[in-house]
Regions:
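Leucine-rich tandem repeat or coiled-coil scaffolds
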Residues: 1-369
Length: 369
């Protein structure tokens, strides 16, 4: 049995920054004075401001004291829309500072907190601050050890705040705590994009995902990559996928799905026309999380081809690192690329088209990663 681990280089809280304090002054002045956004990316000694309103402070070694200074300045700012704070080691104390900011600022739309050693107390503080917030649309907790104990605070947040549409819980190791969240999401009508990748989820949890999909009519994108789903998990997941009519994107990359699961997936969903993007490829975190790549035999590849031909709305297909026969490669390439903007990624092949990312994903693009 695998021991869940957080895939993050930050394993403790850093109280202060490693650079001279005056290096923060220029970006703090920009924030406090509500300076208009630059025409091109504007790098400072610490951090970068972008034309679309991102304050990118990822990997700037802010620590608790640094994030407190930035958060305090942002309370009165009306220019910054997207706050990127990944990998700054500020933990629960820094999360409390961000919470204080979010309880006052109603301009920020994106809060990216990935990889900061935030635990339950910090997650709860963020959630409580967002309950009455009027502007935030997406919250990214990825790679923080918030655990199962944080699920009640997240559920309470979603029950009160109807503006949040993207929730990222990638590699937060909440285990069976996700079951409670999934039960709540059965009747949620606001979350459109849910990230649960890299959480060591197994077949029993897929039953909860399936139940959620059967009842939820709002969710458009579901990310389950790098989980231990396997063929058994696909069987548990399928009833929900078959009943659901709102889902447009699903990611099952590196979920250890083999022949039986693939055949079941393609044959059962052949009549479904709502899926536009399907990722069965290879997740970057596969090896470090102990996940398993997906496999396609010649027989299941035949079912895949039949499925894709039927799915005329599907315009993004990722089969990265999956071995396919030349005949299957040619058919899939011709089929996907004749679709307007169709994108296909296979072992040794990537189409020239780029699948258009959702605006919430664009908003967390960092110049530092």
């Amino acid at each position: 049995m695998q021991t869940p681990q957080i895939l993050c280089p930050v394993d403790h809280v850093k109280m202060t920054f490693t650079f001279p304090k005056h290096e923060l002054n220029s970006v703090i002045d920009f924030i406090i004075n509500n300076v208009p956004l630059p025409a091109t990316d504007k790098p400072y000694s610490v951090g970068t401001v972008t034309p679309d309103g991102r304050l990118d402070m990822c990997k700037q070694q802010l620590g608790v004291q640094g994030i407190e200074l930035v958060a305090s300045a942002l309370k009165i700012n009306q220019i910054i829309k997207h706050l990127l704070l990944g990998t700054n080691a500020f933990g629960n104390p820094g999360a409390a500072a961000v919470a204080g900011l979010l309880s006052e600022n109603n301009t920020i739309e994106t809060v990216y907190l990935g990889c900061n050693y935030i635990e339950q107390a910090g997650c709860t503080a963020i959630c409580e601050a967002l309950e009455e917030n009027q502007s935030v649309k997406s919250v990214w907790f990825k790679r923080n050890p918030i655990g199962a104990e944080s699920m009640p605070a997240i559920i309470k947040l979603l029950s009160k705040n109807k503006r949040i549409r993207t929730l990222d819980l990638v590699n937060t190791c909440a285990g069976e705590g996700f079951h409670t969240l999934l039960e709540y999401l059965e009747n949620n009508d606001t979350i459109e994009r849910l990230y649960l990748s890299g959480n060591y989820l197994t077949a029993p949890t897929m039953k909860f995902v399936s139940n959620m999909l059967s009842r939820n009519t709002r969710l458009k994108s579901l990310y389950l990559s790098a989980n231990n789903i396997g063929d058994e998990g696909v069987a548990e997941l399928l009833p929900g996928l078959m009943n659901n009519t709102s889902l447009e994107e699903i990611s099952l990359a590196s979920c250890g799905i083999a022949d039986a699961g693939m055949e079941l997936l393609f044959t059962s969903l052949k009549a479904k026309k709502n899926i536009k993007s399907l990722d069965l490829g290879y997740a970057a975190s596969t090896k470090v999380l102990g996940a398993k790549a997906n496999q396609l035999s010649h027989a299941s590849a035949n079912h895949l081809v039949e499925y894709i031909i039927e799915q005329t709305n599907l315009c993004n297909l990722n089969l990265g690192r999956i071995s396919l026969a030349e005949t299957h490669i040619n058919i899939l390439r011709d089929e996907i690329e004749k679709r307007n903007g169709g994108r296909l990624e296979m072992n040794g092949y990537q189409s020239k088209h780029t699948y258009t990312a959702h605006q919430d994903s664009k908003a967390i693009k960092s110049v530092y990663r």
